[in-house]
Amino acid sequence: MIAVCAAKFVGYVCKKMGRQGVTWAGKVAIKICPDILEQLSSQVQKAIFATCGTNGKTTTNNMLCAALEAEGQKVICNHTGSNMLNGVVAAFVLASKWNGKIDADYACIEADEASTRHIFPRIKPDYMLLTNLFRDQLDRYGEIDITMNILEEMMRKVPKMQIIVNGDDALSAYLAMDSGNPYVTYGISKPVIKSAANEIREGRFCKRCGEKLEYRFYHYSQLGDYYCPKCGFARPKPDFDAEDVKVGDQLSFCVEGKHIVANYKGFYNVYNILACLLYTSDAADEE
């Protein structure tokens, strides 16, 4: 396949020159063969995972890839965080053979939220993880509602895609619950750390009726146990619920009767690990 050969050559040259050649390889490939991503991604044998959200994308995506590889699975992954169209194309191209053939059980793809418009219709993910939606997005897209509208549209365009969502984030949970797609949730049902009163909170108002949300408690930012006093929209009961969470030099918690200990710091990594566990559990149930 000419597109694959040309892209691999570009990637090799850029690497030799000490430059990051990943996105250039993808750009060349899609210029020569506009449907190359469809051709390559369709060869993934078991499932394609797509990870989106303001925070935790790269960590969770790489964590999932490592977990699958530890089980002996062959995985395509955009490890470097090149999460726009060219970077995703490059991940598939560089994982393929010179003839365009791919031998992979899974693909773990981190996707920029705005770029899902160009990525999802091509790869049609089997699973989509939505980690959270924070103010970060406002710097690039103007309004967080724009990001939500894009993701909502992509959920409709891939109706069989199962959504794995952080139920502690009202914005993310709203998207999943109103999407019509199958979805599962993860969360932390008891307060663990003290949340600052002056933190910026994006999900202050109910996306269904506009009423100000009430919170039984916050974890941090807008993550917590929320409910709408007017229409009844509320945090869903998590399918995967982290209990007995301890934060220190290591993280530890219990989920589904298992005690998890991880060499990570930072409370937010409990969410990343939970998402990864739910990803792999859900995929295993489908096999």
What are these regions (language model features)?
Residues 58-67, 244-257:
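Acidic-glycine-rich active-site phosphate/pyrophosphate-binding loop
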Residues 201, 264-275:
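Short glycine/threonine-rich catalytic loop with a Thr-x-Gly-x-Asp
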Residues 74-79, 259-267:
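A short glycine/serine-rich beta->alpha loop
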Residues 5-13, 250-262:
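Short amphipathic alpha-helical segments and their helix-coil junctions
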Residues 185, 238-240, 256-265:
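Short amphipathic beta-strand/extended segments with alternating polar/hydrophobic composition
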Residues 191-248:
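Cys/His-rich short segments
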Residues 2-187, 195-205, 278-279:
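Phosphate-binding loop of NTP-binding sites
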Residues 279-287:
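Single conserved hydrophobic/aromatic residue that forms the stacking wall/gate
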